[in-house]
Amino acid sequence: MPDSNFGIVLQSLAKQCKVFWNNQIITAFPQKKLQWKNDFKLMVGDRVQLEDGAITKVLARKNELTRPRVANVDQIVLIQSLVQPKINWIQLLKLLVYFNAKLIDEIPILITKTDLDFDPMEKQKLIDLKQFNYQLFFVSKNEPLPSELIDIFSKKLSVFTGQSGVGKSSLINRLDPSLKQKIQALSVNKFGKNTTTKTTLFSFRGGFICDTPGFNVISIKNLKILAAQHFVGFQKMISKCHFSNCYHQYEKDCFVTTSVMKNRYPSWLYEKYRKMIN
């Protein structure tokens, strides 16, 4: 092995980890000098330097999530359904706030079960999100997955998340049946029951996919503060508010509320914001 190589941590297990290096998966161990550091803790997704099978350096992370523990995420793939279960707007918007605050580059939204009867007004609300640069895909079990959807995974580290019942597993199976088999193999214990497992990355289309069984961000610390800064579409408006700590409700010269009154920002979305923080 050359003196200096770089790999990506796929799975971290106690004192060793699985690393994707040179198109193969190897087992590597952090050097003792790294382990002795008080703040040292490897994360799935870490970019690491390798020398003779040992991890000698962890490169700076561009972002990191705590649930699941994964670093250097390129995109969060948010999966929702309009019906069965009905779309939970507050949960969806909370997730967008959380991931916006974590500096995730892209958050494509996938809407499943579009072959079932749904309220067209709910679909229109989703379409409203496109003006804020969210990619939106509608998928049905009766139609092939759009090529534009498959292309978003190319050479990216993608994390899947979605509430139970929205069809996340079915979607992963349609993308690549072998991925679902690998994920299920990790999430079944010796009694055949599903269990929460270690976060693991799987290679896909030159990038990596991370599934998140049971991942839900319902309670977020400092939600009111985060939402005021990172709610959908607020990022380009908050600098024009009179107060730097504006909560966009009753404050003087608030650019957000002015935009709502002038129909420059969707009123239904603003009402969801107020419901979220109050």
Curated annotation (Swiss-Prot):
InterPro entries under this entry? G_CP_dom, P-loop_NTPase, Ribosome_biogen_GTPase_RsgA, RsgA_GTPase_dom
One GO BP: ribosomal small subunit biogenesis
User: Which GO terms of the molecular function aspect are on file?
Assistant: GTP binding; GTPase activity; metal ion binding; rRNA binding
NCBIfam families xrefs: ribosome small subunit-dependent GTPase A
Q: Which cofactor does it need?
A: Zn(2+)
The species this protein was found in: Mycoplasma genitalium (strain ATCC 33530 / DSM 19775 / NCTC 10195 / G37)
Q: Give the CP-type G domain ranges.
A: 62-218
Q: Where does it localize?
A: Cytoplasm
Name the family the entry cites: Belongs to the TRAFAC class YlqF/YawG GTPase family. RsgA subfamily.
What is the stated purpose of this protein? One of several proteins that assist in the late maturation steps of the functional core of the 30S ribosomal subunit. Helps release RbfA from mature subunits. May play a role in the assembly of ribosomal proteins into the subunit. Circularly permuted GTPase that catalyzes slow GTP hydrolysis, GTPase activity is stimulated by the 30S ribosomal subunit.
- The principal location of this protein is cytoplasm
Protein keywords: Cytoplasm, GTP-binding, Hydrolase, Metal-binding, Nucleotide-binding, Ribosome biogenesis, RNA-binding, rRNA-binding, Zinc
Q: One GO CC term of this entry?
A: cytoplasm
What is the enzyme's main class? hydrolase
Q: Which Gene3D superfamilies match?
A: P-loop containing nucleotide triphosphate hydrolases, Probable gtpase engc, domain 3
Which Pfam families does its entry note? RsgA_GTPase
Instruction: Give the protein name, as stated in the record.
Output: Small ribosomal subunit biogenesis GTPase RsgA
Task: Give the binding site residues for Zn(2+).
Answer: 241, 246, 248, 254
